[in-house]
Regions:
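Conserved phosphate-binding loops in N-terminal lobes of ATP-dependent enzymes
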Residues: 1-33, 104-146
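Gly/Ser/Thr-rich helix-start
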Residues: 59-61, 76, 92, 213-214, ...
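N-terminal subdomain of lithium-sensitive/metallo-dependent phosphomonoesterases centered on the IMPase/IPPase/PAP
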Residues: 1-85, 147, 151, 178, ...
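Short capping/connector residues at structural and topological boundaries
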Residues: 73, 99, 127-132, 197, ...
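Generic structural "secondary-structure junction" signal
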Residues: 57-59, 69-71, 76, 110, ...
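Short basic, glycine-rich beta-strand/loop surfaces that mediate nucleic-acid
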Residues: 74-75, 104-107, 204-208
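DPxDG-like acidic metal-binding loop motif
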Residues: 79-90, 94-115
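An extended, acidic
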Residues: 139-289, 293-298
Length: 313
């Protein structure tokens, strides 16, 4: 079952309102205020939509308001049932410090079609479109995955570019990539934006190879599904996190999730820029109005577009 195309613009409006709210805190050195600035207007907009939405990927537990928390019901509670994966402000640090790649993001699918990932780490490899299905595997060596990718893309290994989150936990991956001659492009934060540099007509990277957030992995999968890209992820769970994962219906703690297991059906993805970034330009304050730019995808409609809108102050 596909999602009615009318919902795309409604969800775009929600991320636009979130981005405008967050933009008022750009460079103000206050991550928490910036996050709240996005959450409140986004929640208000989502609650206007005729749907019964449930947050399956959110920012925290119920007692951590003002977050959009896991299990929260959104919408008028009349209409289709949707799973919602949301990060009202991806890049709170980027916003507070006036750095690139902060945005407001949401992914929507029919109820039961999004993986409910706990807020834990997830190993991830992501690649773009037009490649053999299930090409790469987290249990392969880095060298084997890169060799397979180079062959599939008909490129020399030395011409491949890998995006890696700059963390000491990735030292072994970086060492292996460097030894075989892959160019490494580091990101300091911003797991979603980093992983999505593998898509587009002229992608900045050929592969994303990092351990980042589990919830972010599902949001990335939503966008990649619309593009025909691929991701494989595996949750990294300690004992407490295993208990939380069980409550979300996860039984196999070592399971490798491919894209079709993270996003099962139709999906909408919207990301509105707060600061300028790879996905969209940031909010522009034009004096009497705000100019906002959104990167929007709808899988069943094959929609891939960038939309610019204006809001009076």
């Amino acid at each position: 079952m596909s999602i009615d195309s009318k919902y795309l613009n409604l969800f775009i409006k929600a991320t636009e309102k979130g981005a405008i709210g967050a933009s008022k805190f750009i460079g103000k050195q206050d991550k928490i205020a910036a996050d709240k600035g996005a959450v409140d207007p986004m929640r208000k907009e989502l609650n206007k939509i005729n749907m019964e939405g449930t947050v399956v990927i959110g920012e925290g537990e119920m007692d951590e308001a003002p977050m959009l928390y896991i299990g929260e019901k959104l919408g008028t509670l009349k209409g289709p049932k949707f799973d919602i994966a949301v990060d009202p402000l991806e890049g709170t640090k980027f916003t507070a410090n006036n750095q690139p790649n902060a945005f407001s993001v949401i992914a929507i699918a029919k109820q039961g079609d999004l993986l409910s990932a706990p807020d834990t780490y997830m190993e991830k490899i992501a690649i773009g479109a037009n490649l053999p299905k299930n090409l790469l595997d987290l249990d392969n060596s880095v060298k084997k995955n890169i060799t397979l990718l180079a062959a599939a893309k008909k490129k020399n290994i030395s011409d491949l570019k890998a995006c890696v989150l700059k963390r000491t936990r990735h030292d072994d991956i970086v060492k292996e990539l460097t030894e075989i001659g892959v160019q490494i492009n580091y990101i300091t934060d911003g797991d979603i934006a980093g992983a999505l540099t593998v898509i587009g007509n002229n992608p900045k990277n050929d592969i994303y190879y990092s351990t980042g957030g589990g919830p972010e992995g599902v949001i990335v999968a939503a966008a990649l599904a619309c593009y025909g890209g691929q991701i494989q992820g595996r949750l990294i769970l300690d004992d407490d996190e295993k208990m939380r994962a069980k409550k979300l219906g996860i039984k196999d703690f070592n399971k490798k999730y491919n894209i079709d297991e993270m996003v099962k059906g139709d999906v909408i993805f919207c990301a509105t820029g707060v600061t300028d970034g790879d996905l969209a330009k940031g909010v522009e304050d034009l004096g009497n109005e705000y100019k906002v730019t959104t990167f929007a995808l709808h899988r069943s409609q094959k929609t891939i577009k960038t939309i610019v809108n204006f809001y009076n102050k």
